[in-house]
């Protein structure tokens, strides 16, 4: 059974849905995001695209541990828009996602429960349309070895489909690779069985400084 702290879920593809509730038009948008700047950019683009809309309500979650969770009712009564959207994101166990529901007012007030249901439905539909993909958290390692060992190293990399991030293949070789957290222990054991190979775990932020 997969350990839950080794995986995270995102939407497969950005999508759009539309529904009408008592004359009001609700358009749901989903986006993959990696930063708060992404959110600002997507919202700004939508405000230009849907410039006649009255409300741009949204919720988003960032980080694989879901540590950043933000909601915005954009003028709707408190907790009638952003929170219902967020609850749909959480119900699908998603992260790194922005859901925006744009509302064109149709002249009829929907009331608190009506608004909650409308924003909930739009968010749920756009998430379902986007689909969900499960991803594995990765760890990064630096492998140091002599060029005479390159055939053995590359054989292991090919056999276990290991992702090479960077490499410097000279007399003294360096390869930086990524491996899913769930497979990291097994992968390290395989490399350590080969004498002369030196392997060290890297912090993700240090990769750019290496090589």
Enumerate the predicted regions with their spans.
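Short glycine-/aliphatic-rich beta-strand segments at the starts of folded cytosolic domains
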Residues: 132-147
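N-terminal positively charged helical leader segments and presequences
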Residues: 171-172
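Terminal, non-globular segments
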Residues: 177-186
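Structural motif
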Residues: 29, 58, 96-99, 140
């Amino acid at each position: 059974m997969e350990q839950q702290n080794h995986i995270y879920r995102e939407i497969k593809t950005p999508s759009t849905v539309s529904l009408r509730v008592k004359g009001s038009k609700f358009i749901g948008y989903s986006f993959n995001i990696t930063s708060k700047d992404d959110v600002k950019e997507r919202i700004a683009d939508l405000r230009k695209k849907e410039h006649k809309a009255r409300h741009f309500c949204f919720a988003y979650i960032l980080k694989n541990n879901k540590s950043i969770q933000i909601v915005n009712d954009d003028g709707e009564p408190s907790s009638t828009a952003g929170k219902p959207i967020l609850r749909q994101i959480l119900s699908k166990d998603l992260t790194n996602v922005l859901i925006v529901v744009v509302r064109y007012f149709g002249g009829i007030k929907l009331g608190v429960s009506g608004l909650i249901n409308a924003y909930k439905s739009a968010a749920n539909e756009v998430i379902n349309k986007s689909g969900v993909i499960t991803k594995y958290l990765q760890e990064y390692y630096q492998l140091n070895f002599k060029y005479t060992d390159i055939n053995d190293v590359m054989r292991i990399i090919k056999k276990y489909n290991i992702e090479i991030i960077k490499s410097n293949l000279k007399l003294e070789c360096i390869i930086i690779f990524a491996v899913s957290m769930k497979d990291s222990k097994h992968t390290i054991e395989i490399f350590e069985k080969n004498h002369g190979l030196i392997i060290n775990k890297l912090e993700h932020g240090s990769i750019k400084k290496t090589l």
